[in-house]
C-alpha cells in the first residue's frame, strides 16, 4: 500500500462560481477595483486572527522580507533566527540586507532558550521566531527578553495557522505575524502569503513596498495621513497577490478550524501509537501550546547512521515517505546547506537533532484508520531495518 500524503484537499465548491466569473472577466489584478478579492481576503483574515491589519502577498517569504524592511533597520543589522527553519527564512533576512544569527535548537525542535538569551546581545536589532513544523518555542520567555531590550519580534507562522499559546493565536504575539498559502500549508493557493500587524506604520510601509504604486494604497481603506508620509519614499518590490489566489484562499477560511482540529487528532493518534516503541521519541509540546499540525516529527533513539538510512529505506518500500532532515542531500532545512550565508555556525544540538529527526506529512484529510495503518507501517519498517542491520 502506498499513501499519497502530498496531495492537498480539493478547493471547496463555493469557490468555483467566483473563479468562473473572474476567468470570464480577466480581472486578476488586485487594484482594478476597491473591494477586490485580495482586499476582502485581507479583511477576513485580519478579523479571523483578531488583528487590525493584514496584507496578502506573493509568499510567506515575501511577507517576512517586507516586514523586515518595514522595521527600518540599518543595513547589515543582525537578526536572530532559529537554526532549524526553512532556507527561505535566512534568505529573506539576507534579501532585506540584514545579517542572520542562528540560535541552537534542541531535540524537541524548539529554540534552546539559554543559547537564545546568550545571543540576544546589543547587536541584535530584530528576532524572527520560526514556528518550524508548527512547534512553538517558549514565547513567554522570548517576548519578555525582547521587550526588555525593545527588540521587535516577527513570527514566521507558516506552519502554525490555528495554533495558540496560552489561548492567544500564534502570529499575534509578536509585532508582525507571517503566514503561508503554499500548497502544503493549512490554506492552499499553490503559492501566496499574508502578514498581520496592529502597527499602523508597519502596515503602511509594507502595503506601499508590496507594490501599491502611485495612490493604490487608497484602495486599502486606511488613514490617508499615515500613507501620505511614505508616498514615493519607499521602493516598490511588487510582491502582490492575484485575485485568483485570493478567491482560492477565501473559500478555505471556513475550513481552518476543522483542519486544525483534524490535524491535531491525526498527529496525536499516530504519536501515541509509535511512541510505544522505545526506539522512537515524539517530543511533547510545551504546556501553553495548543497545536494545529499537518505533519509529524519524531526522533530515532540510539540509531547509527546505517540504521537510520535502513529505516527510511524500509519506510519507502512500505509506501510512506519518511525522511530524516539531515540525511537528505541538500535538504533546505539543514543549516549547513545554507551556503549563501557567511560561514557555517556551530550548532551542536541542531546538528544532532537534524541527523535523527524524522519528518512525515500527515494531512488533516486522513481518517483515523489510515493513520493507524501508517503507524503500523512505521513500526514494521523499524523492525525490518533493525533486522537487516543485525544480519
Regions of interest found by a model, annotated:
Residues 65-119, 128, 315:
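Conserved PLP-anchoring active-site segment centered on the Schiff-base-forming lysine
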Residues 286, 293-304, 333-342, 355-369:
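Conserved PLP-binding active-site segment of the aspartate aminotransferase-like
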Amino acid at each position: 500500500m502506498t499513501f499519497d500524503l502530498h496531495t492537498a484537499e480539493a478547493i471547496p465548491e463555493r469557490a468555483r462560481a467566483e473563479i468562473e466569473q473572474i476567468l470570464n472577466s480577466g480581472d486578476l489584478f488586485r487594484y482594478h477595483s476597491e473591494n477586490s478579492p485580495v482586499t476582502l481576503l485581507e479583511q477576513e483574515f485580519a478579523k479571523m486572527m483578531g488583528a487590525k491589519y493584514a496584507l496578502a502577498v506573493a509568499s510567506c517569504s515575501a511577507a517576512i522580507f517586507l516586514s523586515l524592511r518595514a522595521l527600518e533597520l540599518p543595513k547589515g543589522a543582525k537578526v536572530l533566527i532559529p537554526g532549524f527553519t526553512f532556507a527561505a527564512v535566512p534568505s529573506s533576512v539576507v534579501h532585506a540586507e540584514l545579517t542572520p544569527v542562528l540560535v541552537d535548537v534542541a531535540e524537541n525542535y524548539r529554540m534552546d532558550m539559554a543559547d537564545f538569551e546568550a545571543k540576544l546581545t546589543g547587536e541584535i536589532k530584530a528576532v524572527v521566531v520560526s514556528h518550524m513544523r508548527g512547534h512553538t518555542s517558549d514565547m513567554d520567555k522570548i517576548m519578555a527578553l525582547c521587550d526588555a531590550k525593545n527588540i521587535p519580534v516577527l513570527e514566521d507562522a507558516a506552519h502554525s495557522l490555528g495554533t495558540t499559546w496560552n489561548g492567544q493565536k500564534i502570529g499575534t504575539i509578536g509585532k508582525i505575524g507571517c503566514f503561508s498559502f503554499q500548497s502544503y500549508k493549512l490554506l492552499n493557493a499553490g503559492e501566496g502569503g499574508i502578514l498581520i500587524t496592529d502597527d499602523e506604520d508597519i502596515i503602511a510601509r509594507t502595503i506601499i513596498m508590496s507594490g501599491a504604486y502611485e495612490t493604490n494604497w487608497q484602495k486599502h481603506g486606511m488613514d490617508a495621513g499615515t500613507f501620505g508620509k511614505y508616498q514615493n519614499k519607499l521602493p516598490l518590490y511588487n510582491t502582490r497577490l492575484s485575485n485568483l489566489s485570493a478567491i482560492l484562499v477565501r473559500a478555505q477560511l471556513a475550513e481552518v478550524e476543522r483542519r486544525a482540529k483534524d490535524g491535531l487528532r491525526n498527529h496525536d493518534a499516530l504519536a501515541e501509537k509509535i511512541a510505544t516503541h522505545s526506539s522512537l521519541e515524539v517530543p511533547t509540546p510545551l504546556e501553553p501550546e495548543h497545536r494545529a499540525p499537518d505533519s509529524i516529527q519524531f526522533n530515532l533513539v540510539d540509531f547509527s547512521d546505517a540504521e537510520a538510512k535502513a529505516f527510511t529505506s524500509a519506510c519507502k518500500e512500505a509506501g510512506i515517505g519518511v525522511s530524516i532532515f539531515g540525511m537528505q542531500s541538500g535538504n533546505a532545512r539543514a543549516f549547513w546547506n545554507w551556503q549563501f550565508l557567511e560561514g557555517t555556525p556551530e550548532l551542536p544540538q541542531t546538528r544532532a537533532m537534524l541527523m535523527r529527526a524524522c519528518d512525515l506529512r500527515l494531512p488533516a484529510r486522513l481518517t483515523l484508520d489510515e493513520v493507524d495503518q501508517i503507524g503500523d507501517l512505521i513500526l514494521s519498517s523499524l523492525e525490518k531495518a533493525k533486522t537487516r542491520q543485525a544480519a
